Regions:
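Ribonuclease/tRNase effector modules and their secretory precursors
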Residues: 2-27, 34-37, 41-171
Length: 171
């Protein structure tokens, strides 16, 4: 309600402080849990901490499951080369920030289908390594466009690299 009742109601001073809280609903992007008694009692922050732990556990499970992908070869109809997954690409994918972080991580386990359906957009020089070619594939994660990055190295290796939800990658 108006007083944000999910926050603890100790006295008029604390409730007015909750109104100014940068971690209140609608403004949250919690990286570090505030270290004070009022925030420790906050139902919202406790729930966010619990969700963060759940995501961390699931990320480790996905990393373990995805290790089986290293033995497989993947293809895209618009791209004429075989795509491989490495341990490095699994880690990079899972560490990549994304607006739909959990959905993006789960997508890794369905990478065969995702790459099959993804639209091949073309290639360019990788901005992190001038000797590497970056190929881009467009996909959708939770109704929002995202771009899968596949790197082609000078030795001919073609590996899944990562995924991004930033359209800056198209520039």
């Amino acid at each position: 309600g108006r007083q944000m009742a999910c926050f603890p109601f100790y006295n008029p001073y604390t409730i007015s402080r909750c109104k100014d809280c940068p971690d209140r609903p609608g403004t949250m992007g919690l990286v570090k849990v505030p270290d004070n008694e009022l925030c420790a009692a906050c139902k919202m922050i406790r729930e966010m901490t619990r969700r963060k732990e759940t995501l961390k556990i699931r990320r480790k499970e996905i990393q373990k499951e995805a290790s089986g992908l290293k033995k497989e070869v993947f293809r895209n109809p618009g791209f004429g080369k075989e795509i491989h997954v490495t341990g490095k690409s699994i880690k990079e994918w899972l560490n990549q920030p994304h607006r739909r972080y959990a959905e993006k991580n789960e997508l890794l386990l369905q990478i065969r289908e995702v790459l099959q359906k993804a639209g091949y957009l073309g290639y360019g020089i990788d901005k992190h390594d001038a000797g590497t070619v970056a190929h881009l594939f467009e996909t959708v994660v939770g109704k929002e466009k995202s771009w899968i990055i596949v790197r082609e190295y000078a030795n001919g290796e073609v590996n899944l690299h990562s995924i991004s939800d930033s359209d800056n990658i198209l520039k």
